[in-house]
Amino acid sequence: NIQAKARDKRYSLLANECQKNNIKYLLLGHHLNDLFENFLIRIVRGSGLNGLISFSKNTKYRGQDLNIMRPLLNLEKKDLLYISNEVFSFFVKDPSNINEDYKRTRIRNLLYSLEKEGLDIKKLKLTINNLKDSDESIKFYVDKNLKKNMVFLKKKNIYILSYNFFDQSHEIIFRSLTKLI
C-alpha cells in the first residue's frame, strides 16, 4: 500500500525531527472525516474493537518519548477548509485524495454515498463513541481479572494464573494475556 508506506515515512521523518529538537508533542491535522474513513477501512479489513477505535486523540509514537496529538478530531473537513480559506487564504490539495486507485479515496466517496442514505456524521460519531465505551468496560474487566487472578513472582520472573483467570469471556482472556506479554 503506497499511501501507508508514505504515511509511515512521514511519521518517521517527523519523529526524527522531534527527537533531534527535543520536541515531546507532535500535533497532527487529522479531522473527523479522517476518523470515519479510518473506521470504514478497518471494517473492510475485519478489525476487532481495538482496531475500530484505534484512531485516538493522544498516543505515544512507537514507544518513544513522543506524544502524537490530534486536536482537530472533533472538526469536520469542511470546517477546516473554511478556516483555512478565511484565515490563511489557502489550503494545500493533495492530488492523491481524489485518485480512485487508492482505497482511502474510494472509502471517502463511499462515505458521501452513505450520507445520502442517512448515515450522517452524528450517527457515525455516536457509533464510535459507543464502541469506545464498550472498550473501556472491557479494559475494566481485564484489569479486574489481572488483579484477582494473577500473581507475578519477581524472583523467578513468572506469572501464576489461577483457574478463574480463564473463567472469563474470550475477549477478557485474550486481552489479559496480551497485557502479560
Model-derived features: positions:
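Conserved anion/nucleotide-ligand pocket segment
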Residues: 109-121
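Non-catalytic, well-ordered alpha-helical scaffold segments
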Residues: 37-38, 104-108, 122-125, 170-178
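Short, structured loop/turn "capping" segments at alpha-beta junctions
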Residues: 90-93, 119-124, 138
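Internal, active-site/partner-interface "lid" segment
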Residues: 97-105, 122-133
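AMP-forming adenylation/ATP pyrophosphatase catalytic core
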Residues: 9-10, 59-65, 126-181
